[in-house]
Amino acid sequence: MASSNMKDETYYIALNMIQNYIIEYNTNKPRKSFVIDSISYDVLKAACKSVIKTNYNEFDIIISRNIDFNVIVTQVLEDKINWGRIITIIAFCAYYSKKVKQDTSPQYYDGIISEAITDAILSKYRSWFIDQDYWNGIRIYKNYSYIFNTASYCIFTASLIIASLAVFKICSFYM
């Protein structure tokens, strides 16, 4: 996919994180020292790892259908953008590149995929990315995810306690 975006500071900020994550995922060599924002990179890396761990079977099915990754990226980002979609796209493309890069030069392929993701995001959602303060927005996503997971855990625990008390009450009624 030829780049349709102007290659300004915003472009290179977006590309930096995406490209370094994909290279690290494929080589297993740390790339944190090469990124602009190491804290956001850690969040991105952990989130992508989680997405790949839980979705690798689905990713394999998509890859087996021989659908061009550009089409997949475009479809995922077609109607709206959020950090979850960006993370999923980056995770999928990293996984995809590791699976199919045997046919081409690794550095060449990582660059193509990274640029395609960056182009797809910025061609339609450049102002959103800037409004998110670039990669700083992913930190807020992490905090909301943590709050949601904590709330879910608390609700589950409260439900378990209430159910246990109800069972105890019913059992004590029959004794």
From Swiss-Prot:
It is found in: Host mitochondrion. The keyword Cell membrane does not apply. One of its GO terms (cellular component) is host cell mitochondrion. Belongs to the Bcl-2 family. Plays a role in the inhibition of host apoptosis by sequestering and inactivating multiple proapoptotic BCL-2 proteins, including BAK1 and BAX. Interacts with host BAX; this interaction inhibits BAX oligomerization and subsequent activation. Interacts with host BAK1. This is Apoptosis regulator Bcl-2 homolog. The lineage of its organism: Viruses, Varidnaviria, Bamfordvirae, Nucleocytoviricota, Pokkesviricetes.
